[in-house]
Amino acid sequence: MGSLRFSIPLDPFDSKRKRFHFSANPSQFPDQFPIHFVTSSIHATRASSIGSSTRVLDKIRVSSLGTEANENAINSASAAPVERSRSSKLSGDQRGTKKYVARKFSFRRGSNDLELENLFVNNGEIDVNYSAIKPGQSLEHCNGILKRLESCSDTNAIKFFDWMRCNGKLVGNFVAYSLILRVLGRREEWDRAEDLIKELCGFHEFQKSYQVFNTVIYACTKKGNVKLASKWFHMMLEFGVRPNVATIGMLMGLYQKNWNVEEAEFAFSHMRKFGIVCESAYSSMITIYTRLRLYDKAEEVIDLMKQDRVRLKLENWLVMLNAYSQQGKMELAESILVSMEAAGFSPNIIAYNTLITGYGKIFKMEAAQGLFHRLCNIGLEPDETSYRSMIEGWGRADNYEEAKHYYQELKRCGYKPNSFNLFTLINLQAKYGDRDGAIKTIEDMTGIGCQYSSILGIILQAYEKVGKIDVVPCVLKGSFHNHIRLNQTSFSSLVMAYVKHGMVDDCLGLLREKKWRDSAFESHLYHLLICSCKESGQLTDAVKIYNHKMESDEEINLHITSTMIDIYTVMGEFSEAEKLYLNLKSSGVVLDRIGFSIVVRMYVKAGSLEEACSVLEIMDEQKDIVPDVYLFRDMLRIYQKCDLQDKLQHLYYRIRKSGIHWNQEMYNCVINCCARALPLDELSGTFEEMIRYGFTPNTVTFNVLLDVYGKAKLFKKVNELFLLAKRHGVVDVISYNTIIAAYGKNKDYTNMSSAIKNMQFDGFSVSLEAYNTLLDAYGKDKQMEKFRSILKRMKKSTSGPDHYTYNIMINIYGEQGWIDEVADVLKELKESGLGPDLCSYNTLIKAYGIGGMVEEAVGLVKEMRGRNIIPDKVTYTNLVTALRRNDEFLEAIKWSLWMKQMGI
């Protein structure tokens, strides 16, 4: 807010009547001053309230800040412009005033003045006639010449200043330095200005030369340079120069404009430290704190204003009034208004507008309306800010009829609504379904110069908020609709909103009507629309948009097609996805990394691992494509599922060399997939590296490593790893099954039994897999009593036998030559409903061979074919072995030759 200077009589505060009474003696500032510090800029009036009230304040006398700084040796030139700029909003339009008052000169026609006039020449611009000037020229004459040049020519002023230096005219000459600092400030030659100020340090009474610093600070405030102005102020304090009112006023005005609270607090504290009273500084500090909602700090400043016996001026009253209104403390705000008028100030439209806005903020519109009607009774007429505040207030109160009434009155009086009013109205019209009103409001928006893109954003926001986005096509009529069809930005905003809310038909309709031409932008827009559908799960809509795109433009776009492949994959339409990929491939479009990732995942989800591998081979041929961490993990999983151990090993070392960042998921994936492809030392090193970097292996990783170490008979590592897994709390049934199997294969029955007990102790039931391991271990070691005991325990438990159990029994009984037991197991297997599988048949053929039942063994092969179970190499190998065991060499040779011919 501007800075006004009024002489205010101060009287004590009457607490019963809630009025502030002040006497002429500032020492009578009341102790019971009932004001809590509140701060704010005058937002209540939407920033236009100050300018709208100038007609009320035309007759108020404004004292320049320069009168407070009459110590200034240069006619307070550095101070007056600051005060004028700060008070212009309240004192009326001063645009006709020249910027630099100090440039106006009037020489009396005495002998000295005539002598000065003879020293100037005019060669396009005023300069000094150095041939006529004498080194003995008086200091007063030199300063007069410099002053004249400063107002006319910066270059010539600097030139003459250098002449004065050469002729010893600058020692102790603060006036000359101040004048040249004005020039340097305008030219922003700050380094030279700093050098000159440092020169002044050695002069006598330099500590009193505040005008030197005021000059450069003023130049900074004119340019809005907060950082540099603060630098000069800090330097001023470091050199021991005491600031004056003008210094503080300029700085606080600059800090208020830029909402720089830290520097404002610094300047304000030093103002009080030096005992300077600058009324506008208090207002600025209150304004900054209020704007930043630091209300407690604002209260402290108001208390300081009382302690410092500040004579309140209009701006002080207004910022306090606004501070209370911003907080909704309207009783205190009204008491401020009463006291302000009692102090001799005329009714002020700014004050009333502030109160109206304050009541609107707390939804007390009856009180706001009462103030509005009171304006005429006190000789004030509502201005545009009054109407605007009423519109906003009724809008907050959700009263469309009243807001609409004041909006119409605003227009009837010849005022224009601001963007806030229009935003309020369009929101109410969207909520209450006034389509015709919305169309008129949109016309008003365009009438006041609002940009179409901004209007569209407001409309979409308003109708989205009330869930009526489907109404938007009905209110976008005429020129607005034409603009949307012609303007790419507005067009894209609207179709994106339509797609977001499932209005794909409206989107397609608008796409058919577009009038702009930009193929690159259009492709990008289609891609965004399709991606938006994908993210919101509207996959069918994405297909519609894609089909529309292909109808109007058959050119294949890599990004759009890749996204559609991904969408078809999610929909499970793998044939459509593959068709798009093949189109890309045949068109010669080269896939990028993302495209390859999408196609690979498509084939993986479709179960076509071989096709996925072929795509990866094509990708490897393109040396410029470097997979990211996600694609690397996909490749690892694919090669693992395809059991491509060589590729896994090669890929592992490729990942190591790629320089990508390994996270926890990458370590787990590499260990899980490459466990059987890597040397044991490399695998162990990767695991130790993972632990060293603070990553936690998951359960699968621990189980895979337990299996690898167990098969390698590294039981010490198995125990260490198992304990580590328990420490991390990731041990599961599979972990126990794995170590039980490892001990079983190594015939370590003691540790195997101990693992079974620990499994039960940890709350796990003995699993079917564990029972199968025990049966296999004891059976192969021909401990048949143990075998039968385990079998009985398993049948009593909840774990019923599976194919693997029956196959173990057939194998063990067959190895013993117990054909009757084998027959019983086969019968039980068939009665269980499971029936023999490939492994069962292979085991039976082996058992029949041992038992001398060759014909039955050959019959099993025929039975397999009859049940559509395709014999494998193990089947035929077991059959040939059975025939040889039973001296059927000729038949064995026939089967061997047949296997060779079939490539088995």
UniProtKB/Swiss-Prot annotation:
GO terms for cellular component: chloroplast stroma. Residues 75-94 are annotated as: Disordered. GO terms for molecular function: DNA binding; mRNA binding. Its main location: plastid. Residues 1-61 form a transit peptide. It is found in: Plastid, Chloroplast. PPR repeats lie at residues 173-203, 209-243, 244-274, 278-312, 313-347, 348-382, 383-417, 418-452, 487-521, 522-553, 557-591, 592-622, 628-662, 663-697, 698-732, 733-766, 767-801, 802-836, 837-871, 872-904. The keyword Cell cycle does not apply. Keywords: Chloroplast, Plastid, Repeat, Transit peptide. Belongs to the PPR family. P subfamily. This is Pentatricopeptide repeat-containing protein At4g30825, chloroplastic.
